[in-house]
Swiss-Prot record:
This is Protein-export protein SecB. Keywords: Chaperone, Cytoplasm, Protein transport, Translocation, Transport. It is found in: Cytoplasm. The gene is secB. PANTHER family: PROTEIN-EXPORT PROTEIN SECB, PTHR36918. One of its GO terms (biological process) is protein tetramerization. It comes from Granulibacter bethesdensis (strain ATCC BAA-1260 / CGDNIH1).
């Protein structure tokens, strides 16, 4: 008799929509590694290059009828050697990586979609992008670029603050 009650309760809950966040696929969307001064740069490099990093999160909805999105981490690492007495720095290498994922959101409230796409999805992609960038720079003949953990919450909040300032400025 108890089994019947459990069966009835289970049946009344309806079909499950699946997990709230599904990673459908992850992929390298674009990858570029340039050493403009090769091969001379390897003999001429006198100091540890300074690596300037730029990271952006891009989101695009793939299907209007479903909550399916592409999230891309766009990372640019440019290593330069600043030589004392010279005005212009020498570019050692430029690495650019766009690492993407396709995500399906199930049953996530509308007010939570933006932080999931701009914080949680990049957090899932980041370790893979970090490894790819380190491998590419190492295989390019340089010490691997080791990205430190990124505070995606702070990036998202900064983006929102900038958008609010632009909205106020245009009003």
């Amino acid at each position: 008799m108890q089994d019947e009650a459990v069966t009835e309760n289970t049946a009344s809950t309806g079909p499950q929509a699946g997990p709230p966040l599904v990673v459908n696929v992850q992929y390298v969307k674009d990858l570029s590694f340039e050493v403009p001064g090769a091969p001379q740069i390897f003999a001429a490099l006198r100091t540890q290059p300074q690596v300037d990093l730029n990271l952006d999160v891009q989101v695009r909805r793939l299907e209007e009828q479903a909550h399916i999105y592409e999230v891309v981490l766009a990372i640019r690492a440019e290593a330069v050697e600043r030589v004392e007495g010279e005005e212009k720095a020498n570019t050692v290498f430029i690495a650019e990586l766009s690492y993407g994922g396709v995500f399906t959101l199930n049953g996530i409230p509308d007010e939570s979609i933006e932080p999931v796409l701009l914080v949680e999805c990049p957090r899932l992609l980041f370790p893979f992008a970090r490894t790819i960038l380190a491998t590419v720079t190492r295989e390019g003949g340089f010490p691997p670029v080791q990205l430190q953990p990124i505070d995606f919450v702070a990036l998202w909040q900064a983006r929102r603050a900038q958008q609010q300032q632009e909205t106020v400025g245009n009003a």
